Amino acid sequence: MADCTTMRLASSVTIILLLLVASQALVVSGESSSSAMQSKTLNMNKLLNISEDHSPNGGRHWMQRMQPDSCSEQNVVVYQNNAEHLPSGIPTYSVEIINVCTACTVYDVHISCGEFASAELVDPSQFQRIGFNDCLVKGGGRLGPSEAVSFQYSNSFAYPLAVANVACE
């Protein structure tokens, strides 16, 4: 009789511990997915040039990037992310360069890129280093409203890429 009671007690304790571990795992995974969602939202806000409005009426507003006469480097954003490594183990990065102006075309887009190089060929008609810290998007050609250029490169480290110069139509 005592053995049966001891086994029931041990089983009950084991079940309770398993439930506690499972609930803790759910809480932890909920926090990480929540923070991942916040991070994705923040990245998307940067990508789309959305900023938080802390005015009394609250809400969000779009930063105006619509008039060609307000041409600036801010009309183009560079978004860079880790991608799958090459079979050789070399890290790969995906890059998206986007004209966020919805009413203007940009051209002659130059990106500061250090000594950009890639273990895998990047299509030079899309992105090409033309000098130290100077890379050219689409050979200087036009990037229409909301148009994007995407490519991947492979190197042991990510290059800091930033818009250096643009012209607008």
From Swiss-Prot:
First and last residue of the signal peptide: 1-25
Tissue: Expressed in roots, and at low levels in anthers during meiosis.
Pfam families, alphabetized: TPD1_C (PF24068)
Source domain of life: Eukaryota
InterPro entries: TPD1
Entry keyword annotation includes Signal: yes
Known role: May play a role during anther development.
Identification of the protein by name: TPD1 protein homolog 1B
Species annotation: Oryza sativa subsp. japonica
